[in-house]
From Swiss-Prot:
Organism: Pseudothermotoga lettingae (strain ATCC BAA-301 / DSM 14385 / NBRC 107922 / TMO) (Thermotoga lettingae)
Reaction(s) this enzyme catalyzes, per UniProt: tRNA(Ser) + L-serine + ATP = L-seryl-tRNA(Ser) + AMP + diphosphate + H(+); tRNA(Sec) + L-serine + ATP = L-seryl-tRNA(Sec) + AMP + diphosphate + H(+)
One of the record's GO cellular component terms: cytoplasm
Lineage of origin: Bacteria, Thermotogati, Thermotogota, Thermotogae, Thermotogales
Protein name: Serine--tRNA ligase
Binding positions for ATP per the UniProt entry: 264-266, 351-354
Top-rank EC class of the record's enzyme: ligase
Amino acid sequence: MIDIRLIREKPDFVKKALEKRNYEKKMVDDLLSLDAQFRELTNQINQLRAQRNSISKMVAQAKSSGKTEEIENLTEEGKKIGRQIDSIEDQLKEIKVQMEKLMLLVPNIPDDSVPEGKDETSNREIRKWGDPKKFDYNPQAHWDLGPSLGLMDFDRAAKLSGSRFTVMYGMFAKLERALTNFMLDMHTKEHGYTEVWLPHIVKRETMTITGQLPKFEEEAYRIEADDLFLIPTAEVPLVALRSNEILEEKDLPLLYTAYTPCYRREAGSYGKDVRGMIRQHQFDKVELVWITTPERSFEDLETLVSHAEEVLRRLELPYRVIQLCSGDLGFGAAKTYDLEVWLPSYNSYKEISSCSNDTDFQARRGNIRYRRKDGKISFVHTLNGSGVAVGRTLVAIIENYQRADGRIDVPKALQPYLGCEVLG
């Protein structure tokens, strides 16, 4: 949620920011109209309350003088003002609800460093690491290689749950677990994160804090009987951990990491990446979250990105870093870098991590603040990123490390976790 004062004081700036993000600028005019009504009614109700207080004093004076008729007239006038106040209070409540609903649909403001563009075609490549492997044979896609080894089963997954689910056996199941432990060990032992074990089911309010609701409710798995949601990412509970709290500046930044399954309906992605494990309804991910100060948040974003990159470097997987343009930014992000790993089956790079600075957008929605050294209370900035998506990393290893005979070499960094050098 952005600051309503920004909309009041710089409406043209906000409209331009919304246009950069392909959003309708009309919502700014709608908010300004509601805000003007709210402030006008607030002035009216304050004046009426002042009148009522004045009448109360006059009634007291009349009582002391025994002026019965005056008391009755003043009392009736006071009741009339009270009814006016009640009516205006009802109007204020309704306007406040409308404003809150509309404010929750306004995206974050892109940072000045974000390139302007309509869609992903305007994204910028920042850097590459590693060279895609050149095979002297036709490499297999993971959706062929996995089943041929008897370690990946899409048919039985469909029998259990429908499309876009996977069953893995034996060493592939162990590889998924090894990757999770490898990532968590790196982030906690080398990068200073605190590991957190989290609920995978959260309240509507929790989903609203990070911006999943109300805009993306159709993408979420909802438990209707209890109005609870399966998390689409560990970012949701990690950020909300500190909602309605005031932190101390000396304790910032807070660095959290968590492994969780993630659940997404993918309602808007029909026909995309329908084969294999690239786009699943359930997938594993190690998440990284920072709660930091405004002064250092963009520098911290660069650090967070480097932590995600280090996972891919240790696994010796070719990747590139992309900066998203304004039209491709996520709803709550002010600035985002995507990490894309090379996949031979696509002969291209595919997203494996998205790292964002949400500035104070989530903090305002969740009322996450901190006390500065001078005693002033301000909103924190929140950062999030995948460190990284486990299933897509598994796919990248299977495809990039495959041999001509179908067996798969194990990256050196994972050999201590798996206890072997070759799979299959």
